[in-house]
Structures are given as C-alpha cells and as structure tokens.
C-alpha cells in the first residue's frame, strides 16, 4: 500500500460535506493499494446545456480524486495543492454515472503527478486527465 495516511471510505466521503464535491454528487467508492476511485452522477448538476456531461464536471471529478490521493501521500503538517490539470475528452455521456480511477504517475517529495481516467457505466474511457500537485509543508 502506498498511502501514508490511512483513511476509510466513510472518512474520505465525510471530507466532502458542504463542498462542491458533495454538490456534484461525487462519492469515493474504492481505496485500493495504489488506486482511489469515485463515482459521479451524470444529471442536471453535471450536464452542459446540450444534455451531455460537462467537461468541467469531469475535470472536477479528476481534481477531486487526484487532490485527495495526493493528500493521502503526505505526512502530518503537509498538504497538497493542484498546479496543473489536463483533460482529454474522448466520448460523450448523457446519463447514468461515471467512475473516476486515480493512480500515481510520479510521487516525489515536492511534487506528484496523477492519472485519472473517467469511465462510463459500460466501462468505456470517456476522459483522461493528468493532475500535477505540489507538496507544501
């Protein structure tokens, strides 16, 4: 297991109370040895005007996952902040849920890189994101 902080899914989800994460309906669903996953509904909260999943919602899911994963790689007195987010959208989604899967690309002392892949309910890749974070403290 790569994580330096040991949180349960319930504890992870509690951090979202009264935030944009909760407003978008993002829920952490899996914490593995080197992976963090979450689901987000594709509905009125996450649609763009043409009834498809908004690219910004996919980016919000990615940054949520990468930032939390980055935080779990810090020690007491440290935090992480996002420095760069790149998102490539591959296919539209109009309803249901999407699932984000976050895994590390680089875990340095001062910076981290995370890959977050967003899948639709059929398991098709909808979006590929890369998040860079800086470790502070």
From Swiss-Prot:
Taxonomic lineage: Bacteria, Pseudomonadati, Pseudomonadota, Gammaproteobacteria, Enterobacterales
Origin: domain of life: Bacteria
Protein's name according to its UniProt entry: Proofreading thioesterase EntH
Enzyme class: hydrolase
Gene: entH
Biological-process GO terms, alphabetical: enterobactin biosynthetic process
Keyword annotations of the record: Cytoplasm, Hydrolase
GO terms assigned for molecular function: 1,4-dihydroxy-2-naphthoyl-CoA thioesterase activity
Protein's cellular compartments: Cytoplasm
SUPFAM superfamilies associated with the record: Thioesterase/thiol ester dehydrase-isomerase
Organism: Escherichia coli O157:H7 (strain EC4115 / EHEC)
HAMAP family xrefs: Thioesterase_EntH
GO CC, one annotated term: cytosol
Main location: cytoplasm
Family annotation (Gene3D superfamilies): Hotdog Thioesterase (3.10.129.10)
Pathway per the UniProt entry: Siderophore biosynthesis; enterobactin biosynthesis
Active site per UniProt: 63
Subunit-structure text: Homotetramer. Dimer of dimers. Interacts specifically with the aryl carrier protein (ArCP) domain of EntB.
Family: Belongs to the thioesterase PaaI family.
The protein's role, per its UniProt record: Required for optimal enterobactin synthesis. Acts as a proofreading enzyme that prevents EntB misacylation by hydrolyzing the thioester bound existing between EntB and wrongly charged molecules.
């Amino acid at each position: 297991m790569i994580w330096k902080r040991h949180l349960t899914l319930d504890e992870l989800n509690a951090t979202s109370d009264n935030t944009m994460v909760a407003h978008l309906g993002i829920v952490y669903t899996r914490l593995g040895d080197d992976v963090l996953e979450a689901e987000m509904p594709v509905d009125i909260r996450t649609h763009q005007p043409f009834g498809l999943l908004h690219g910004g919602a996919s980016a919000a899911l990615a940054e949520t996952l990468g930032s939390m994963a980055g935080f779990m790689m810090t020690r007491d007195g440290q935090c992480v902040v996002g420095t760069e987010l790149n998102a490539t959208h591959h296919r539209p989604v109009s309803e249901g849920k999407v699932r984000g899967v976050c895994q590390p690309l680089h875990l340095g002392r001062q910076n981290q890189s995370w890959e977050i892949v967003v899948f639709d309910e059929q398991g098709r890749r909808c979006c590929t994101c890369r998040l860079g974070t800086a470790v502070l403290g």
